[in-house]
């Protein structure tokens, strides 16, 4: 949903519509507004570029994976999340989840590598990289 929400934010419409309408409606709206003929995949890739660029700017400001966290009660054993049934007392395996998320986004420890920007067609220009030699994970 992040990529779809990035698109809805750029449309300046309520992102909760994505739950009711889905990507198909966004494609119709986009094509109607612009006169273009983009596909669902192209629109989601646009959202991926938006979200990745937002993360890249956060990286430039000094933020990385160490800043992606949750309140202690979700990840520390003494104050497990209250709940009912199967969720009662469960803890979030945050580090594992973060690494899986970063792999899906093709980031390295929360940092957008230059190769990812290039793959998305984002040209930032010379001398602005934040990847510190980080390379995109190899495709499995």
Where are these regions (language model features)?
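Extended C-terminal regions of large enzymes
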Residues: 1-140
């Amino acid at each position: 949903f992040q990529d779809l929400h990035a698109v809805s934010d750029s449309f300046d419409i309520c992102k909760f519509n994505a739950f009711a309408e889905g990507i198909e409606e966004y494609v119709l709206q986009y094509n109607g507004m612009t006169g273009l003929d983009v596909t669902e995949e192209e629109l989601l890739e646009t959202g991926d570029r938006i979200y990745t660029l937002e993360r890249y700017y956060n990286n430039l400001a000094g933020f990385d994976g160490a800043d992606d966290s949750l309140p202690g009660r979700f990840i520390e054993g003494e104050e497990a999340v209250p709940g009912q049934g199967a969720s009662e007392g469960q803890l979030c395996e945050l580090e594992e989840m973060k690494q899986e998320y970063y792999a899906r986004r093709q980031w390295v420890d929360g940092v957008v590598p230059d190769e990812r920007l290039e793959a998305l067609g984002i040209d930032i220009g010379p001398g602005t990289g934040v990847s510190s030699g980080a390379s995109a994970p190899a495709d499995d």
